[in-house]
């Protein structure tokens, strides 16, 4: 023992010598207030990297060594310990703590005591069996249920681990590489880009315009720019904060539980909450439980007095032995409550979610939010990104125009002047964050933005070495790309002066230019060729190519302060056309969505023409569909927006704010919205949507953190699979609910009525007079319920755990996407489900009561004569009742596999091996239960012919189920509730919005409703008080219309008014000029204007159409 202590001491001393900086000291760097003094004491960046055995240029070594092992031993791993999960024994204790089960256990113990002593039992040698059997049944039910819960928890933990495992960019052994977030160590060099969530504490090494949002940590609302202390800047990077601008590198100083975020997360761990459906079903289970409790209490209030009254009427003395029957009645009542409480409902949800999530993960959907599994099935619209989701995100430059040439890539280096090549390649290399490195697949390739990777590959055609360019050019200032700016610029030192390189959306870059490079590489005024470049942009866009504009400008030192990007009067280098092939499976996936009643909208930053062509190729843009650009969309008023949304299919040149506005307004209109996003600024839209899908490959960490589901392959088809699984999970719950409620009603009713109608005294007299010596005639009629506590507990196990396992694991079928989505306000139990529940319950009760009251006569014809008569209410009689009851449930479980009017419950039957296994297991246990249970299960062995009869009786539920499903029934149309408060974030409309925001070309179809003849809004009226005859102009444009075309003043839709006219409540006055529609005011009248060319019209504020009076037109 002493030797081991000495060895441990030596190892600690060795680590202290190798890594002299303690964990506590490193932690002080990012504590509040931040440790500037500690940083200085450690020797700043160089001193700290030396003490941590790291190199700020080459990072940690790739080779394993004792130093690296000691590093992990001292500073820990970047992994938080798993939250303490509930062990199996704890789950068992939780299950046993149920008040109803405790009552049942207490009653069973009392039954054992009373049944095993002479004082209270006629047969003490066997009187204890019932109580012990109940205890064994309770243990089995609790054990199987708890084991199931334990396995579900393990599945969720496994998925959670997978969702947390991400890769970050770093430098090791002098090479840029991808590092698992769990493998990040103290001393690592990590690269940071806009949108990253910092994975560990660290200090700034170098970078440009790196700003972090630390508001959730320090309370500082403004972004904090990072740099070196000597520049009076903050060098400390805190784990959990977000990079909102710029890029850079950092030296890791703390990981895992020692990092700032690790300490915070360890203190904030809370248990996961139930999903909305779980909570809804828990409430339903409680209500059903109250019904069972009421039935049990009522049964006791009737049965116990009845027992004593019967004894008194027949002059039978009441003795101490009567305590045992009373206890059995109490046990029966408690068992009714146990059976009535459908604990399986929340269990079925958990099981369906666990099973569905595991299967979805295999199909490239990583679920981060459990509730989203339920919501996905109700999605009515999908707002999808284009790049990487609808397309393959495998980009390559295929054409373009530089210096007026470059139709193809062949011999391009010979077609473009050398000095222009130098400008072009310098700009593509330095104005980029992409780099060549080893990918997660082990391949050497460009890593980063796919657009930038395509440009770097294009630069290779000119012999460009991007590393040489980046070493040669010194960056002075960086102006990062943003979805709002649609461009990125970098300012570098160049020949004693400065040069700005800019790239971005081609039409935006072109608009910033004052000159261009001609075929010889000379600078010429842009006015000479602007029309040509615009034509080329449209040509490339018509071929579904992304167009990127490239430009530059030279500056003198001191020409401006460069705090704001000087992106004006640029020299236009040219345009490159980038091809991003459509994913081959997308058109079919879009068509599936249409059949499923889901509207697909494309929201993209590309220009309108490119977006239209891609959308048309996907099948998203259809005849009569609308396309619009983001800046125009955000200028629409709420009523105008509501008018175009039903037909809006493409939103081009959109910003994240436009996407958020679109999602919010769709939700306001009652839609269940799924949205995709990959950028940092997509976070609000992803959070706002009912289901947010982030990109697992191209998505930023901020987008992933804000999403509900991560698309591991960035593929639109995976969204369709997620919707399929969402519907399947919902259907699985409905199937189980349909099955369980039927069993509940039947079991409780049979136990309740059977107990109340049994006449023990008469049965005893009958049995004693029979005088037969065989085994059945020697038995006595049984007191109380025809279904004993042990039998009901077995039924409870069948209908709770086993049925949940069988029905919750049904695989999805294509038919799920052949119907409209379930409304988010749709009832959990539909009319067709009630039809099946009530119909099956009525059938089963009719059969069981027939067997209960006449079964001893009916089955007498099927047993050998040697058996003797079947005693009414005897052991054999009640065994037949119990066996028929179980077989009715087995066959009804097959019925429950289908919902609605579908006829064939055996379709895809063999596609679910779990269902088949459960059926075989249940059948096998039932045979053992009846044949060998004896006194423990209160059963008597049956003859083969009786088994056949029970199977035939149970199978009756199949044709009856078919007939029930054939009965037509109309489901009520559930209207989605329109929220009182809008979730959309509206920007203030421009005072002069373009007319194309509101009106399409003359051929467009109207898409909005006429004004109402009654209700909150009234139509305009003339001076005599009569309503004006109105007609409606169209709103929006079809896919083939040019929505940017202004409406000429000579349009036949425009009218003039010859005198003031009153306007009804709820209408607006709108002035139509030759170019614009302007809301004048909210007054009650409008008139002909003095100004020429101006016309007033009226518009319903809550309608999307314009109503123009036609009975007062100047001819």
Swiss-Prot record:
It is a multi-pass membrane protein. Residues 121-126, 257-287, 350-735, 854-873, 935-943 are lumenal. The keyword Repressor does not apply. One of its GO terms (biological process) is calcium ion transport. Belongs to the cation transport ATPase (P-type) (TC 3.A.3) family. Type IIB subfamily. This is Calcium-transporting ATPase PAT1. It is found in: Contractile vacuole membrane; Cell membrane. GO terms for cellular component: contractile vacuolar membrane; intracellular membrane-bounded organelle; membrane; pathogen-containing vacuole; plasma membrane. Induction: By calcium. It catalyses: Ca(2+)(in) + ATP + H2O = Ca(2+)(out) + ADP + phosphate + H(+). Gene3D superfamilies: Calcium-transporting ATPase, cytoplasmic domain N, Calcium-transporting ATPase, cytoplasmic transduction domain A, Calcium-transporting ATPase, transmembrane domain, HAD superfamily/HAD-like. It comes from Dictyostelium discoideum. Its EC number is 7.2.2.10. Mg(2+) binds at residues 678, 682. Residues 1040-1053 have a biased composition (Low complexity). The chain crosses the membrane at residues 100-120, 127-147, 236-256, 288-308, 329-349, 736-756, 833-853, 874-894, 914-934, 944-964. Residues 1-99, 148-235, 309-328, 757-832, 895-913, 965-1115 are stromal. Coiled coil: none annotated. One of its GO terms (molecular function) is calcium ion binding. The gene is patA.
């Amino acid at each position: 023992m002493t030797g081991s202590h000495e060895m441990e001491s030596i190892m600690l001393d060795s680590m202290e010598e190798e890594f002299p900086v303690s964990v506590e000291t490193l932690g002080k760097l990012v504590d509040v207030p931040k440790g500037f003094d500690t940083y200085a004491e450690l020797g700043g960046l160089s001193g700290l990297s030396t003490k941590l055995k790291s190199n700020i240029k080459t990072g940690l070594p790739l080779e394993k060594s004792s130093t690296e092992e000691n590093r992990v031993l001292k500073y820990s791993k970047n992994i938080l310990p798993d939250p303490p999960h509930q062990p199996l024994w704890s789950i068992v204790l939780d299950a046993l703590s149920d008040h109803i089960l405790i009552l049942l256990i207490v009653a069973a113990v009392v039954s054992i005591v009373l049944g095993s002593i002479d004082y209270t039992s006629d047969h003490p040698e066997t009187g204890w069996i019932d109580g012990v059997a109940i205890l064994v049944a309770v243990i089995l039910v609790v054990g199987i249920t708890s084991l199931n819960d334990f396995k579900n928890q393990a599945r969720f933990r496994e998925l959670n681990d997978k969702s947390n495992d991400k890769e970050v960019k770093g430098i090791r052994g002098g090479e840029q590489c991808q590092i698992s977030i769990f493998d990040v160590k103290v001393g690592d060099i990590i690269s940071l880009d806009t949108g990253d969530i910092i994975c560990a504490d660290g200090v700034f090494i170098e970078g440009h315009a790196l700003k972090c949002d630390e508001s959730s940590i320090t309370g500082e609302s403004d972004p904090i720019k990072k740099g070196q202390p000597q520049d009076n800047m903050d060098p400390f990077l805190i784990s959990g904060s977000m990079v909102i601008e710029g890029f850079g590198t950092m030296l890791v100083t703390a990981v895992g539980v020692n990092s700032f975020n690790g300490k915070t997360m360890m203190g904030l761990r809370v248990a996961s909450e139930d999903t909305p459906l779980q909570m809804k079903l828990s409430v339903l289970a409680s209500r059903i439980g109250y019904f069972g409790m009421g039935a049990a209490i009522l049964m006791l209030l009737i049965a116990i007095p009845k027992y004593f009254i019967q004894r008194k009427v027949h002059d039978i003395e009441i003795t101490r032995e009567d305590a045992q029957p009373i206890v059995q009645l109490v046990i029966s009542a408690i068992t009714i409550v146990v059976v009535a409480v459908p604990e399986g409902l929340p269990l079925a949800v958990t099981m369906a979610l666990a099973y569905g999530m595991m299967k979805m993960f295999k199909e490239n959907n990583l679920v981060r939010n459990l509730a989203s599994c339920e919501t996905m099935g109700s999605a009515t619209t999908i707002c999808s990104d284009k790049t990487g989701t609808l397309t393959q995100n495998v980009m390559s430059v295929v054409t373009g125009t530089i210096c007026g040439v470059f139709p193809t890539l062949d011999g391009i280096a010979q077609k473009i002047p050398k000095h222009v090549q130098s400008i072009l390649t310098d700009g593509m290399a330095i104005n980029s964050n992409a780099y060549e490195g080893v990918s997660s697949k082990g391949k050497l390739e460009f890593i980063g933005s796919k657009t930038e990777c395509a440009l770097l590959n294009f630069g290779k055609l000119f012999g460009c070495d991007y590393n040489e360019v980046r070493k040669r050019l010194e960056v002075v200032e960086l102006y990062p790309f943003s979805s709002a700016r649609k461009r990125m610029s970098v300012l570098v030192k160049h020949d004693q002066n400065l040069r700005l390189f800019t790239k971005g959306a081609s039409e935006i870059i072109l608009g910033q230019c004052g000159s261009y490079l001609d075929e010889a590489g000379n600078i010429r005024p842009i006015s000479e060729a602007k029309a040509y470049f615009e034509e080329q942009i449209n040509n490339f866009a018509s071929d579904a190519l992304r167009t990127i504009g490239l430009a530059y400008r030279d500056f003198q030192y001191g020409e401006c302060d460069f705090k704001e990007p000087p992106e004006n009067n640029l020299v236009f280098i040219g345009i490159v056309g980038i091809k991003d092939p459509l994913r081959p499976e997308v058109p079919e996936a879009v068509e599936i969505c249409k059949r499923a009643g889901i509207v697909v909208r494309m929201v993209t930053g590309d220009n309108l023409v490119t977006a239209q062509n891609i959308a048309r190729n996907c099948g998203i843009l259809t005849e009569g569909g609308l396309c619009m650009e983001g800046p125009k969309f955000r200028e629409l008023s709420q009523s105008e927006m509501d008018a175009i949304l039903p037909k809006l299919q493409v939103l081009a040149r959109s910003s994240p704010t436009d996407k958020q506005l679109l999602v919010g307004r769709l939700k306001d209109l009652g839609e269940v919205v799924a949205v995709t996003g990959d950028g940092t600024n997509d976070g609000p839209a992803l959070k706002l949507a009912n289901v947010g899908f982030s990109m697992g490959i191209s998505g930023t960490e901020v987008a992933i953190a804000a999403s509900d589901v991560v698309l591991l392959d960035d593929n639109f088809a995976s969204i369709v699979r997620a919707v399929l699984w969402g519907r399947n999970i919902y259907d699985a719950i409905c199937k189980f609910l349909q099955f369980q409620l039927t069993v509940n009603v039947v079991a409780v009713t049979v136990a309740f009525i059977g107990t109340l109608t049994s006449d023990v005294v008469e049965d005893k007299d009958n049995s004693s007079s029979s005088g037969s010596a065989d085994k059945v005639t020697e038995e006595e009629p049984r007191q109380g319920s025809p279904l004993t506590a042990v039998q009901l507990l077995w039924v409870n196990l069948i209908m709770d755990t086993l049925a949940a396992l069988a029905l919750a694991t049904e695989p999805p079928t294509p038919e799920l996407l052949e119907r409209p989505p379930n409304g988010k306000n749709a009832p959990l139990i539909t009319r067709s489900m009630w039809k099946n529940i009530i119909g099956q319950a009525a059938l089963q009760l009719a059969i069981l009561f027939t067997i209960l009251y006449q079964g001893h006569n009916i089955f007498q014809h099927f047993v050998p004569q040697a058996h003797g008569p079947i005693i009414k209410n005897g052991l054999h009689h009640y065994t037949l009742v119990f066996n028929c009851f179980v077989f009715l449930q087995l066959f009804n479980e097959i019925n429950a596999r289908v919902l609605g009017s579908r006829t064939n419950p055996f379709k895809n039957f063999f596609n679910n091996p779990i269902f088949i296994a459960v059926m075989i297991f249940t059948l096998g246990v039932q045979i053992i239960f009846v044949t060998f249970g004896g006194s423990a299960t209160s059963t008597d062995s049956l003859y083969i012919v009786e088994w056949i009869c029970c199977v035939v009786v149970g199978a009756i539920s199949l044709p009856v189920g078919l007939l029930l499903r054939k009965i037509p029934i109309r489901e009520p149309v559930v209207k989605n509730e329109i929220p009182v408060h809008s979730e959309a974030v509206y920007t203030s409309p421009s005072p002069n919005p373009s007319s194309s925001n509101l009106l399409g070309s003359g051929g467009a179809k109207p898409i909005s409703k006429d004004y109402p003849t009654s209700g909150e809004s009234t139509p305009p009226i003339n001076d005599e008080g009569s309503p004006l005859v109105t007609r409606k102009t169209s709103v929006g444009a079809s896919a083939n219309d040019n929505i940017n075309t202004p409406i000429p003043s000579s349009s036949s839709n425009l009218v003039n008014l010859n005198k003031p006219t009153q306007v009804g409540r709820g209408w607006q006055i709108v002035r139509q000029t030759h170019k614009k529609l302007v809301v004048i005011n909210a007054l009650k009248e409008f008139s002909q204007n003095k100004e020429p060319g101006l016309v007033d019209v009226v518009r319903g504020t809550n309608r999307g159409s314009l109503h123009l009076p036609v009975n007062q037109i100047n001819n």
